[in-house]
Amino acid sequence: VDAPRAEHPKGRKIGIEHLGNVVGGAATEYLNVPGQFMKDCVRKILSEQGIPVWFGADCHPMMDRKNGAWATDLFEYGRVYGVDFDLDKEQRVRFADSAMNHAMAFVGVDVADDGSTTRRWRVENSWGCKIADKGYFTMDDPWFSEFVYEVAVPKSMLPKEYLDALEEPAIMLPAWDPMGALA
């Protein structure tokens, strides 16, 4: 996950009290990593293996559902209302303006000709084939940075320091913490 609040250090395991998918089963725990690390992992999986990558995001901001687009500059709310809407990711989570609320799959990535700049991501959504491009959306790279909170990648992609962190006790967050909104 990319848990953006300063009190949740990157490279540490976090858990949510009372969050589990099976009674008596293993607790749901996450490794808190920088958003760029998540992007790099997803891009590598899509580019080298061509397999979809599960992720969780706040799917509502800056979304054009009909046309299937997510972009940070899709709408100019600040210009229309004369109000500054420039909270960063940490502030949006802290003040309950953003949380993971929907799971989808990355199925493609658009890389610029320079080979290093990611422009867009192709997303398979679960809302049916009558919206967007037969159920597929396009996400710009800045939107990923701002609204994607978790990805599922194989442990084999983790550096030693992150693998070691998985062996440490988790920082436990309360049941109502936004990082537990999508289990």
For each predicted feature, which ranges?
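Secondary-structure boundary elements
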Residues: 44-51, 112-115
